[in-house]
A protein has these predicted regions:
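Phosphate-group recognition and catalysis centered on beta-loop-alpha active-site segments
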Residues: 1-104
Length: 104
């Protein structure tokens, strides 16, 4: 019996953590599953992000529970990792689950 490989926040060593790109890459690399962090926005959307504060990952000050989803979706959650990930948006929990389910 082999151990299960669970990708922490997706393939976060190669792509911005908790993004659709990171979760897809984890699957491509053979991870058996992943873990993610979920926050709730002011207008009750479930989004996937580790930190409540947006500062570190976007360079824009904000607190996810105090923000509306549409405002969060305008922020870039990828360029902090590398310019190649610029434009990466915060995913909803539903998007992450659908992406994982339909990717194989």
């Amino acid at each position: 019996m082999r151990p299960l490989i669970i990708a922490h926040r997706g393939a976060s060593h190669l792509a911005p953590e908790n993004t659709l790109t990171a979760f897809r890459l984890a699957k491509t690399l053979g991870a058996d599953g992943f873990e993610c962090d979920v926050q709730i926005t002011r207008d009750r959307h479930l989004v996937v992000a580790h930190d409540y504060l947006t500062d570190l990952k976007t360079g824009v000050h904000g607190n996810i529970p105090d923000m509306d989803f549409d405002d969060l979706r305008q922020l870039d959650f990828g360029k902090w990792k590398s310019p190649e990930f610029a434009g990466e948006k915060i995913p909803t929990l539903e998007e992450v689950l659908k992406s994982h389910r339909t990717s194989g």
